[in-house]
């Protein structure tokens, strides 16, 4: 779930609520596709993915532990991956045995009826696996996809700004200022007042989409009808309030200005300096967003849970239901997603927050992150993952949230009233669901 988790696909949807966004790239690249054809049962596996992360896991860990298995690996950029996978799954011709599924589109496939059930694998490991990834990977009582990691979201804040304006940089104390969504907005006003208007609580209101989504009680669709959870209406109100009161830096996620806020170099439209108090990011955001783009601020950051439990990103592994190599496919998924020995080594090597609870409990007290001034982020992430509900995720989420972000943008920017924006959103979704 590193490399930057094509969560950036989802991120583009969220950021679209405030500006056109060019999402950051990854190390993905195209590769020629291969076919499983009609092979007899064997240990040969064709694996497709959208990220080089899985390739490294197979090459550096799985293959040495399974020297008798020949793996043919193909990688396709995230935005092209569904278009490559869909036709072969639907036709049954040229399907990979095993493939990765990104959070933005995983439920589409989990609900498709085209995946190999993994119930027997899950039955062996269920007591040691985190709940929410398994909830997302399950449908109608069957498990179809398994994830090796969890990606809970947190709030990362500048210690120096917390000391200056809140009087403390202690994560326990700072959490009190952002403990829920209403308190978060109150603190946005407090920061404005104490800083004489130069400190924005976030650089982009789009950062708040995932926490508000995490606060929902209902999914987007119930009985084939759109449901707008109160948390999503509150998100609309928040976006408008933040825009009107200049509580955010008025830049888009993944934009140059968004990154500038991390470095402390953001300026407003009049070229005045702007301080950015915090960023709401998941596990991979620490290593591949903050540390990568603002190395000069190392030691001036800390982390707390923030206003709501949420997750962001992740990769699930699944198999085609018609694979001729079902036993080998299941063994690969079981190893990569659940194996204690492998995941302990992988977690230590990569820093990834794995979903295996045995491994979490064994290693979580051993971490100290210099970028966070020695704070143990790993232990906190493991705790945050416990409060995430994966049962609200649906295959239609990506398209619905794209429509929603467009209407939130129109409302926040004063182009539509809230009523107009909601009515247009409802019309778009109704057409989609028909």
Residue ranges of each PLM-predicted region?
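Conserved N-terminal structural module of periplasmic/extracytoplasmic solute-binding proteins
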Residues: 2, 8-107, 123, 327-331, ...
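Short helices/loops that flank or line small-molecule/ion binding pockets
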Residues: 82-94, 111-112, 162, 185-190, ...
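Hinge/lid segment of periplasmic solute-binding proteins
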Residues: 102-154, 163, 182-185, 298-305, ...
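C-terminal capping/gating helix-and-loop segments adjacent to ligand/active sites or protein-protein/ligand interfaces
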Residues: 53-54, 370-429, 433
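N-terminal export leaders
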Residues: 7-8, 162
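Helix-loop-helix "hinge/cap" segment bordering the ligand-binding cleft or interdomain interface
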Residues: 119, 123-124, 137-207, 219-253, ...
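Extracytoplasmic ligand-binding clamshell segments of periplasmic binding protein
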Residues: 80-84, 217-293, 298-300, 327
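Mature extracytoplasmic/periplasmic domains
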Residues: 115, 287, 310-311, 315-398
